Amino acid sequence: MGTILSDKEVVVLTGAGISAESGVRTFRDNDGLWENHRVEDVATPEAWVSDQSLVWRFYQARRNQLLEVLPNPAHFALAQLESKTESFTLITQNVDDLHERGGSESVIHMHGRLQTLRCETTGLSEVRMGEHDLGGDFVLCNCCAVSSRMRPDIVWFGEIPMEMDVICREVENCDVFIVIGSSGHVYPAAGLVNLANSNDAHTILVNFE
């Protein structure tokens, strides 16, 4: 496929399905990471305000899980496709780093990243994956004169996905739009599929379900 697409502008959107193949649990699964918590209790700005300790423990568990999972063949295949394609952008709805560990370089995380934490005062993000960053205590930033508490650098329900201007521009200009591990029927993925189709891109849906 890399040879066929080598002179095309290719954009790939990945969803939870591609990470599930590596053992990353998703809230859609019966045994998923979210099953003991309502989404409203752990993944909204309101939850952070009402019970920071619960939200922090929840995301620390997810951050620690990153140490236990590895990229799968799909991650490596996308990195190989990128290396053979002149213009390639990978947009992921996932918050893990499996694409990067699989070799992908041009990655946009629209829902944030588990590896980074965000200063509540400045909004700046820092990679914080040291042993002391993964325990039960809150983590303080390095960017303020008086260190501030950091929050998960995640787009919670009700918040706007990151880098949407860049994402929409890339999708508008692409020749081929590939959706992997997502149904493509739920927003914002559905909106990106519609955007690609309206600009005459060739759309390919690869869903693991």
Residue ranges and their predicted role:
Residues 1-209:
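Conserved catalytic core of sirtuin-type NAD+-dependent deacylases
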